[in-house]
């Protein structure tokens, strides 16, 4: 690209109206995190990953995937261009589309591999923490348990318990829309099922509503002599 073309301002390229539900796309990053905050490298990866899928996206759409303002996306794009990782392709005399260069694609692949490796390590560490947490039940001779909460956390707990001595007899949830559906090999039941199941403990797998769920099942737990564990 010539010097004159790179000196132009970088307004958003005009875009056709997206299909309903097309945006926002799933992002590699997690918004509003206290402990796992995106680094500059992670944001660059997110932008490169998004551009690899569609280089005609506006800066607004790029900002949605990387949780950046339009002005910040503009700065990131300029930096990536200066590093030879992204090229600006004129769409008309006012706007651009953005394409990863060969070097940019190489960087995207290597960073994606490193990013995925970190996530796998984090996932493994989380499963280890869960196994350590529920080990106190095992020392009490408890084997037959139910999980309360058919959520993503519940999926992690089921995975963590897969190679243990625990026998998960049921997964229950308060949401009527979930009840009756399959969840990782279990049919999601109403909490009423806890009255009839031959369980020894209930593990609450909802981080967001642990106290409310604990209060909900406390009378049943007292009546049946069940252990109730919050994660």
Where do the model's predicted regions map?
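Short linear motifs in intrinsically disordered/low-complexity regions
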Residues: 13, 20-22, 33, 168, ...
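Hydrophobic, well-ordered beta-alpha structural blocks that scaffold small-molecule cofactor pockets
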Residues: 52, 60, 65-85, 91-231
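Long, low-complexity, charged/polar intrinsically disordered regions in eukaryotic proteins
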Residues: 1-30
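Short alpha-helical segments that sit at the start of domains
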Residues: 23-46
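Short amphipathic alpha-helical interface segments
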Residues: 42-56
């Amino acid at each position: 690209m010539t010097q004159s073309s790179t000196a132009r301002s970088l307004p958003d390229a005009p875009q056709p109206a997206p299909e309903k539900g097309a945006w926002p796309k799933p992002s590699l990053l997690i918004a509003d995190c206290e402990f796992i905050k995106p680094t500059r490298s992670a944001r660059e990866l997110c932008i490169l990953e998004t551009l690899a899928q569609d280089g005609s996206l506006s800066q607004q759409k790029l900002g949605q995937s990387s949780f950046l303002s339009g002005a910040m996306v503009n700065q990131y794009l300029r930096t990536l261009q200066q590093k030879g990782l992204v090229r600006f392709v004129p769409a008309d005399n006012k706007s651009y589309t953005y394409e990863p260069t060969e070097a940019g694609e190489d960087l995207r692949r290597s960073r994606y591999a490193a990013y995925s490796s970190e996530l796998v390590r984090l996932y493994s560490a989380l499963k280890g923490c869960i196994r350590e947490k529920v080990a106190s039940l095992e020392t009490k001779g408890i084997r037959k348990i139910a999980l309360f909460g058919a959520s993503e956390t519940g999926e992690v707990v089921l995975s963590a318990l897969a190679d243990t001595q625990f026998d998960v007899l049921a997964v229950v949830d308060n949401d009527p829309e979930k009840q009756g559906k399959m969840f990782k090999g279990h049919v999601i039941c109403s909490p009423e099922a806890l009255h009839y199941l031959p369980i020894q403990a209930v593990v609450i797998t909802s981080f967001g509503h642990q106290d409310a769920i604990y209060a909900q099942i406390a009378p049943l737990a007292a009546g049946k002599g069940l252990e109730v564990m919050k994660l």
